[in-house]
Amino acid sequence: MRDMGEAAVETLLGAVRLPMKKLVDTSLQTRPDVALYEHATSSLYTVKAVVVLPPYDVLELLALLDMRSTESFRHTMRILLDGVFVDGAVLHATPPSSPHSAESMTLNWLAVQNAKVHLPNRDYVFLKYGNCYALCGQCSPRRPAFMPTTSSTPSRPLKDTVAVSVWESVDVTECGPLPNDLNTLRLHFRQTGYVLEYMPRSRDASHGICISFFMSEEVPSSRSVSSLGKAWVVRMAQSVANLHHALVHQYVAEGRQRQLDMPRPMKPTAASRCHCCSKRFSILRRRHPCHLCSELVCKRCLDKQFQVDLCATCRLPSSMSLFKYWAS
């Protein structure tokens, strides 16, 4: 499985360098915050969806995409594939190859809706393999110019790090296609997954994280992708825009769990100033509690973007920290 995952990573990183053309199709529903590109071969139609997030640590996003339990897989995929997700499960989870490796390897089953309601649902059995790599001058026969980054090594410049989470379908004897009466069609993921790269604003500063989500559709020989198949691929690819929401949601959920495990003293309810900007509260400047740290802040210092009230301090990318599966 590890060799298959590493080979799939090589294929996906190769797709990053493919000359893709911008997808322009007025018949498709597209999101203004997602840049779409397409590439077609005789057997595969691929869409790359690109979004830019604030400068989070790529290891936090890799931890989010690990999902090594069925509960976390269903919870995260329900947010990512909003309106498309049907069901899913983690069939097997393998621990990282070393105590300090960010390697993630799970075997998953996923069912999603098709392009139209009357069409059978789609389901996939696939290997989800993720890791974080450092760009370097050395070459390896398997991954030229890429080497795994471990927490035991000194931190490298942000621009020299890339994280990958790839989905590659596998044939598992014990997980054959579902019965016909369930109206579900078994298909395959090929050249599918996330590539996370830092976007440098200048030589020494990071501007954000560029996330590319590749989604592909197998095409029968001597045919082009159907309009329904193309619509489905585009809809799935655009789900990358929900990654920010999923990250914040997981961050808040883990923060609340830590508060239950280690309760902190209650904050004074009569604080006279905003915890973030230090402006004095008044009739016009009301108190609002942060749902994570419980500090009292004014409305201007409160972020309700993801239906969760977070103060300006908690919503900073540098404050974002998730449980690391490789550190357990």
Question: What residue ranges belong to the model's regions?
Answer:
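Eukaryotic helix-grip
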Residues: 1-328
